[in-house]
Amino acid sequence: MKDVDNLKSIKEEWVCETGSDNQPLGNNQQSNCEYFVDSLFEEAQKVSSKCVSPAEQKKQVDVNIKLWKNGFTVNDDFRSYSDGASQQFLNSIKKGELPSELQGIFDKEEVDVKVEDKKNEICLSTKPVFQPFSGQGHRLGSATPKIVSKAKNIEVENKNNLSAVPLNNLEPITNIQIWLANGKRIVQKFNITHRVSHIKDFIEKYQGSQRSPPFSLATALPVLRLLDETLTLEEADLQNAVIIQRLQKTASFRELSEH
């Protein structure tokens, strides 16, 4: 892969900022922003030449990055250019490396990062929605995810199972997106007073007779393991969150599955 020089002064070049969401940029800011996005997009094209041979190819998950005038999105999760974590994330992209944040989510399969240039447009939606990408882009390399995304439209199946969570209409309700280890997405309503353990119970009931190894839960982008299952969704700040099922491979499960 072609080596790419690091930015000499990332804070000086990272000028795609707005005083508040969706405010227009000044002429100087817009010019510098366009230069930065052009530079980043050009480097993404350069490093896209590295390919994986058919013998080495693994199952793939796509991550869609769009570079807007007022920030950038990762699978429609909006981020500011001025944030320190965002700067580190985009530095990795510019060097053709998979950001450590994505490495923490995907550790079994190949990640295909798509970079789209939308510097002349303002991103109006900042609602985080984790969804697959379909279309052309620039591959930055490979890594290993547990999630297998598909470019096809994903529809919610087994709707009868989705009614397993009792809701209190007198309390706030939130939508939780759940990505199962097999790549299937579920959207389920919960009260914010439900606990993390209720999400885990729901997944077990949803999968029903389909035997699966023990699993844990984590949020996506940024990665956060949900270790305390007694927390409510409000306490864990999981309103409208994206939850990932992460399988735990154990010998005891293999023994059980043989019976």
Curated annotation (Swiss-Prot):
Region of interest (Required for inhibition of CHRNA3 ubiquitination and translocation of CHRNA3 to the plasma membrane resulting in an increase in acetylcholine-gated nicotinic acetylcholine receptor currents), ranges: 1-164
Taxonomic source organism: Homo sapiens (Human)
Function: Acts to repress the ubiquitination and subsequent endoplasmic reticulum-associated degradation of CHRNA3 by the STUB1-VCP-UBXN2A complex in cortical neurons. Also acts to promote the translocation of CHRNA3 to the plasma membrane and subsequently increases plasma membrane acetylcholine-gated ion-channel activation. Plays a role in the inhibition of STUB1-mediated TP53 degradation, via its interaction with HSPA9 which acts to inhibit TP53 binding to HSPA9. Positively mediates the ubiquitination and proteosomal degradation of RICTOR, may thereby act as a negative regulator of the mTORC2 pathway.
4Fe-4S among keywords: no
Other noteworthy facts: Acts as a tumor suppressor in cancer cells via stabilization of TP53 and subsequent promotion of TP53-mediated apoptosis. Acts as a tumor suppressor in colorectal cancer by repressing cell migration, growth, tumor dedifferentiation and cancer stem cell populations. May act as a biomarker of positive survival outcome in both colon and rectal adenocarcinoma patients.
Subcellular location: Golgi apparatus; Endoplasmic reticulum; Perikaryon; Cell projection, Dendrite
Keywords from the named record: Cell projection, Cytoplasm, Endoplasmic reticulum, Golgi apparatus, Nucleus, Ubl conjugation
SEP domain: residues covered: 60-124
Pfam families: SEP (PF08059), UBX (PF00789)
Quaternary data: Part of a complex composed of STUB1/CHIP, VCP/p97, CHRNA3, and UBXN2A that modulates the ubiquitination and endoplasmic reticulum-associated degradation (ERAD) of CHRNA3. Within the complex UBXN2A acts as a scaffold protein required for the interaction of CHRNA3 with VCP/p97, this interaction also inhibits CHRNA3 ubiquitination by STUB1/CHIP and subsequently ERAD. Interacts (via SEP domain) with CHRNA3 and interacts (via UBX domain) with VCP/P97; these interactions are required for the interaction of CHRNA3 with the STUB1-VCP-UBXN2A complex.
SMART domains linked to this entry: SEP, UBX
Post-translational modification: Ubiquitinated.
Tissue-specificity statement: Expressed in the colon (at protein level).
Protein name from the UniProt record: UBX domain-containing protein 2A
Record's signal peptide: none
Required for interaction with VCP, as annotated region: 167-259
Any GO MF annotation of the entry: acetylcholine receptor binding
GO biological process, one term: negative regulation of proteolysis
Domain UBX, first and last residues per copy: 169-246
Entries under InterPro entries matching the protein: NSFL1C_SEP_dom_sf, SEP_domain, Ubiquitin-like_domsf, UBX_dom
Chain's gene name: UBXN2A
A single GO cellular-component term on record: perikaryon
Stretches the record annotates as Required for interaction with CHRNA3: 1-151
